[in-house]
């Protein structure tokens, strides 16, 4: 009986050590272009570039740490749209990315790809609605919305300085940052409101934002660190420091709000984890 319990303890310790070893999680590629979390919080999709010019899209199961390769592309530097564009989940079973001149989706179950729309320019961020009905994306000058059903692209707003981050809350409002400014686009996609002053009261020089499950609560990266803020209560909690020489560049929160994944500027192929 003692041997049995000792075996169980060893298994638990081994599993815990495995999870610890995965924080930070290092990819096989040299540079992570983008990563996002599935709507059910079970998977991470990430896009990486290797030294030999290959572009890979992979899925990581967050519970087990298992990594599966989905798509591999050998690109030239002239393939700018594919190199610099992001990747996201359209649904739990479908991802979206850029292939050639088009926004495309890839079904994780049947492995089929479908073209969604032809793109206007070199893309940066891609952020899909959790209901799978639409996708927000940006280039260097413009914020767009793609309707999946209609296959049509609409111009939403000018973003002349380029978007640093995008996040969609449970009410399908889009939050995005341009430099040290924070904006909110209503769920109808019609009205843009700047909310920088509300955030800046709690975080110095905010430049990344991630929505949480609560309407007025966000994860925000600023000059002095990453914070969890509640603008309705005027409260902020510091989660971790922001290194001056190696600042945070990407933050992704799981849907249940319990785990934050983030990447720093010089951590080219490394994603760190913070339990909240």
Residue ranges and their predicted role:
Residues 1-24:
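Bacterial Sec-dependent N-terminal signal peptides
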Residues 22-276:
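Sequence signature of WD/YWTD-type beta-propeller architectures
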